[in-house]
Amino acid sequence: MTRIENIEIFFIEYPFPKNLNYQYSGGLVENMIVGLIKITDSDGEYGLGEVTHAQFTHKPIIGLVEHFKNILIGLEIGKINNAWEKMYGSSVFWNREGIAIGVMGGINIAMYDLLGKKLELPVYQLIGGLVKEKIKIYASNGLFESSEDLIKDANKAYDMGFRIYKMRIIKPDTIVNLVKDFKKEFANRMELIVDAVQGSTANPWANKVSINLAKELEKYKILFFEEPCRVENIEGYKEIKKSTTLNIAGAESIPTARAFKPYLQSEVFDIVQFDIAT
């Protein structure tokens, strides 16, 4: 089996058009920067993996990639779990959560990509095999305060072939009317997801706000209600889960299986949204 020869990081930036005011709970996002990790083996073949949040943590990612590169150079490319343990063991004092785990995730993905190329197998065959022939995907946007703008954007997604649309909440007191207007426009042509975006916001709502919202949204039969409270607020999730019949989704910023274990044991999620490179 070939060995790791080099690990590099590349950044690809897309500046948003000036007329696009992309606000979210963390503030204004002016561009999208993707961090791609490239692992090259001793045969000159390579695999790619992605690190999320590169637009916020550009410089730290560069240093972390260099740190882990020094540990992994010379390792056989098939020793993916061993690579994870080496990286975690070298950083456990300061890296139980956060962007360093995300960089480890990107390296993990790149190793799988490279191994799949060497074995001429898709990665899903390397991690247990095919589960479903088809899966539904959704268009994710919906940061709008007016029904007109929301429906216009959702129609664009519909014309592109999407049949599920995710909208995000800007103000909790406007969301029910937006959902009502969306359902009036699309009826059964398009399903809807509502993201409260409370998992990462600096000043989350009180639990009762999300509980009341969930109760109001039940009659609109949305697919799921995403991140109705801060991700570390497991007691809040328990309270919300008990109060509604809606499917509750979250966990996209819970970085490891160890960190997710208490959520799994508490059964607070109907839909788990792991992001393995966060």
What do these predicted regions represent?
Residues 1-48, 52-53:
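Structured beta-strand/loop patches that form or line metal/cofactor-binding pockets in enzymes
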Residues 4, 37, 44, 68, ...:
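Conserved, mostly hydrophobic/aromatic
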Residues 40-118:
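Metal- or metallocofactor-binding catalytic centers and their adjacent structured scaffolds
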Residues 49, 194, 226, 251, ...:
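Active-site flanking residues adjacent to catalytic metal/cofactor-binding acidic residues
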Residues 99, 108-144:
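Glycine-rich, aromatic-flanked loop segments that form ligand/cofactor-binding clefts
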Residues 113, 125, 180, 238, ...:
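Active-site phosphate/pyrophosphate- and oxyanion-stabilizing loops and adjacent acidic/basic residues
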Residues 128-244:
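Metal-dependent enolase-superfamily TIM-barrel catalytic cores that perform enediolate-based chemistry
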Residues 231-278:
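Catalytic alpha/beta core domains of metabolic enzymes, predominantly
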